[in-house]
Amino acid sequence: MATEYDVVILGGGTGGYVAAIRAAQLGLKTAVVEKEKLGGTCLHKGCIPSKALLRSAEVYRTAREADQFGVETAGVSLNFEKVQQRKQAVVDKLAAGVNHLMKKGKIDVYTGYGRILGPSIFSPLPGTISVERGNGEENDMLIPKQVIIATGSRPRMLPGLEVDGKSVLTSDEALQMEELPQSIIIVGGGVIGIEWASMLHDFGVKVTVIEYADRILPTEDLEISKEMESLLKKKGIQFITGAKVLPDTMTKTSDDISIQAEKDGETVTYSAEKMLVSIGRQANIEGIGLENTDIVTENGMISVNESCQTKESHIYAIGDVIGGLQLAHVASHEGIIAVEHFAGLNPHPLDPTLVPKCIYSSPEAASVGLTEDEAKANGHNVKIGKFPFMAIGKALVYGESDGFVKIVADRDTDDILGVHMIGPHVTDMISEAGLAKVLDATPWEVGQTIHPHPTLSEAIGEAALAADGKAIHF
């Protein structure tokens, strides 16, 4: 059976379903093809379930430290089965919400594996979508005027470190653990690795992180990376940076797993009950029919222009499958850009320097714009405003006074180039910095904005004032 659509979206993750909703809002007949569950990696294997686990870890840690607040507790224990049940309940509730939005928008959802066909009896152009349901039924044929590829990504693997789902895991398998290990080696000290390190430590797991770069969080501002490593080391997490894991040395027993890492010419063996491989993500471009089109790929990702168009002008691609900043909110924004572009609304292209990035560890970190080193490399005459949370009353009230807010600005133009934060609840504060950049606010203007007292947001205002040497409380 063949059905015509204005747009068919291949992939029902965050980028795909948001694109579908926007298309439906514009009156376009829309379909989504999803091989698993609507919501994709973010809802089922990433953002949401991991943050639910992080929240449980935070509550567990707070309960153990309750005496610091004058609250005496005895026999605090962790029921990891209930932790997982709560996580799944959160996921299920949000998944039901996404399904409701599809019905509300009268968006057709096809559950199956979608593949792009070349020119055929259905269309002289490549882009007809064949949907294989996998149950012996005849494939559905969808004939769209426009196609959006939103097939997402999966954990990248290190050759030789094959995942077995038991002792060697990716974040996908780790989210489904029924029991916590006593110890774990995390290969990779990027955002995902650090979130897992923080979470598992708060759950009481002994954590060792091995990172190839010379510092953890190598894409973040240098001061943020150093502060994060320092604070997590104080908690008891072990970091080995500038080290190359040697996959061929991995050995397993019934009790643990061992692997060697080379650092400064020396080889050291590390052992733990489990290993988590967290070295980035790989775009899902295989098996979707790209060979039937003129779409260009580079380094395993689909190449697009600023409007998310591929070389086939009627086929767009968004989200992790095109690389760049592999973040759910970026995929959503790109989905809207793609839809509005083929609808003739001339949307603004995405500016990577306006995208907030968040790390949900303890402490949290967040940033938007250029790092100090990037700003200097781009030729800016840089000035810095920095303010510590230890001088913020609300942070002391919370008992979370580590960290700081750092503003990178141009001394000549007074433009805010980047804002970087590490400390309590900064992932909920970074949007102010993003808005300041969108509105081309100067540090002085942010500093003149009245920030209520006592709040953590005062640190932003004070850091802005500090850029001109005018901070009040430090």
Curated annotation (Swiss-Prot):
Compartment list: Cytoplasm
Gene Ontology CC entries for this record: cytoplasm
Active site positions: H453
Cofactor(s) in the UniProt record: FAD
Binding, NAD(+): G188, G189, G190, V191, I192, E211, V245, S278, I279, G280, R281
Keywords: Cytoplasm, Disulfide bond, FAD, Flavoprotein, NAD, Oxidoreductase, Redox-active center
Family recorded in the similarity comment: Belongs to the class-I pyridine nucleotide-disulfide oxidoreductase family.
Name of the featured protein: Dihydrolipoyl dehydrogenase
